[in-house]
UniProtKB/Swiss-Prot annotation:
Catalytic component of the signal peptidase complex (SPC) which catalyzes the cleavage of N-terminal signal sequences from nascent proteins as they are translocated into the lumen of the endoplasmic reticulum. Specifically cleaves N-terminal signal peptides that contain a hydrophobic alpha-helix (h-region) shorter than 18-20 amino acids. GO terms for cellular component: signal peptidase complex. Residues 1-18 are cytoplasmic. PANTHER family: SIGNAL PEPTIDASE COMPLEX CATALYTIC SUBUNIT SEC11 (PTHR10806:SF6). This is Signal peptidase complex catalytic subunit sec11. It is found in: Endoplasmic reticulum membrane. It catalyses: Cleavage of hydrophobic, N-terminal signal or leader sequences from secreted and periplasmic proteins. The gene is sec11. It comes from Aspergillus fumigatus (strain ATCC MYA-4609 / CBS 101355 / FGSC A1100 / Af293) (Neosartorya fumigata). Residues 40-192 are lumenal. The lineage of its organism: Eukaryota, Fungi, Dikarya, Ascomycota, Pezizomycotina. GO terms for molecular function: peptidase activity; serine-type endopeptidase activity. Signal peptide: none annotated. Its main location: endoplasmic reticulum.
Length: 192
């Protein structure tokens, strides 16, 4: 009877150790993500290119690293933005900037040369698209506001690394297969 309790207690300890290790891995990943978010000043410091609208600069599945500490976006800079009301990041290039004066976007000709107003309003376009992004913006929105809509500016990338997340979102059955394989690995590792 004592040997039964001893083996049962050791398997319980082993199970608890595995649960704690798993919790440690999850909390470490979460802390790294939040730390990176604070460091880059971006709610999403790493994003995946979901379409071919920025080809040839970025391909579908490229992993982008963002930085959001610049007070303004420059002409030609590649930015990631979210459309108001939707949570899908869009990666496009800034093709026009407009200074904001008295709460309204003014055309560059309307601002005198001596004005030091930073450009806050942006117009974007995908490199592979014919037209600008005004059709993608929220209803009654003609420009992106730098502080409100921009998630970050692209500072680096890794080609094709993000394709795994695209595959998992496009093929839900693949998630089930991967979870099954991971569960099987845990069971097989326990038996050793």
């Amino acid at each position: 009877m004592l040997s039964f309790l001893s083996s049962n207690l050791s398997s319980t300890r082993q199970s608890m150790a595995q649960v704690l290790n798993f919790a440690l891995v999850l909390s470490t990943a979460f802390m790294l993500w939040k730390g990176l978010s604070v460091f880059t000043a971006s709610s999403s410091p790493i994003v995946v290119v979901l379409s071919g609208s920025m080809e040839p600069a970025f391909q579908r599945g490229d992993l982008l690293f963002l930085w959001n500490r610049s007070p303004r976006a420059e002409l030609g800079e590649i930015v990631v933005y979210n459309v108001r009301g939707k949570d899908i990041p869009i990666v496009h290039r800034v093709v026009r900037t407009f200074p904001q004066i008295e709460g309204k976007a003014k055309k560059v000709k309307e601002v005198n040369e001596a004005s030091s107003v930073p450009p806050n309003m942006l117009l974007t376009k995908g490199d592979n698209n014919i037209a600008d992004d005004t059709e993608l913006y929220a209803k009654n929105q003609d420009f992106l506001h730098r502080e409100e809509d921009i998630v970050g500016s692209v500072r680096g990338y890794m080609p094709m690394v993000g394709y795994v997340t695209i595959m998992l979102s496009e093929h839900p059955w693949l998630k089930t297969v991967l979870l099954g394989i991971m569960g099987l690995m845990v069971i097989l590792q326990r038996e050793q």
